[in-house]
């Protein structure tokens, strides 16, 4: 009898403990919606279509709308939200491209369950509200004129040179069809693969020569090159993701102190940040949130497993229990992939915020530090 009573008491304590811990805030970072194939800055000229002339595809719109629906199903009840409202309890933000801004607003429409916004013609003012000045800084590391140190550091990594050699024959085959392709540039391998992948869906007759085996190899190389370029050294982590890490850690600190996420439209009532980024910036964010020793569902992740496909998201959940805060990271590789928990080295799945900060802060840099580091080398 005493044993039974003791068991009930233990279960009651566990239930009370679980009930006391509440999800308070979520950062959702989304890869932007699929768009009409075009030439991408930094890559080869394959389509001769400028990115500014490229619009979201119908499939892309559907993917991010359904993603918004999924995010609502995951978090609406847990966050205590009765109705999603971008002026009150969630903040849709994006990088400065028009496509990304429209993408984040359509994801927000899915969050709200408002189909009428899926094909809405958004005004310039509505799009402008999704961005703020720091967005321009997050992405500058991919510009050799603004951040030569990144390109210099990448060029000095033997593993990157080896990977380029590993897919040289495939890139030479592509070069037969598109002369501007440079097989010696990591960014050309990545952006060539992403462009051909879109063409195989949107303009298949133009790339019949690109076999499935070739595409598989180019994806493998693209994933590996991106991961090496953002994680191989501490300097690469700081240059690629250090600014966005610094910004998020600052936001999290404000939230743990009962303050609003800076710039958020809903102030302290805001519960969710919905950030739409290009694929490369999502990779850079993963790089700083997955330091050496981090695991993905208990395993050391491969570059292929963290390469963001269409509908990829990274969710940063913040829990609070009587003033004690914890953080949980979840990554979805794409729209049809299950969520996998990112566990930091030496931490539980729900990592105490102070410990979370201590593990990651070495990669965080402010704008001045980033500027100085970017300019600390010449390229080429």
UniProtKB/Swiss-Prot annotation:
Disulfide bonds join 147-374, 167-221, 347-351. It comes from the Eukaryota. Residues 1-19 form the signal peptide. One of its GO terms (cellular component) is extracellular region. Its main location: secreted. Gene3D superfamilies: Phosphoglycerate mutase-like. Pfam families: His_Phos_2 (PF00328). Keywords: Disulfide bond, Secreted, Signal. It is found in: Secreted. SUPFAM superfamilies: Phosphoglycerate mutase-like. The keyword Isomerase does not apply. One of its GO terms (molecular function) is phosphatase activity. Belongs to the histidine acid phosphatase family. Probably modulates blood feeding of fleas on vertebrate species by binding and sequestering different mediators involved in the host response. Binds histamine. Binds leukotriene C4. Does not bind serotonin, adrenaline, noradrenaline, leukotriene B4, leukotriene D4, leukotriene E4, ADP, and stable analogs of thromboxane A2: U-46619 and cTXA2. Lipids and biogenic amines bind independently through different binding pockets. This is Acid phosphatase-like protein XcAP-3. It comes from Xenopsylla cheopis (Oriental rat flea).
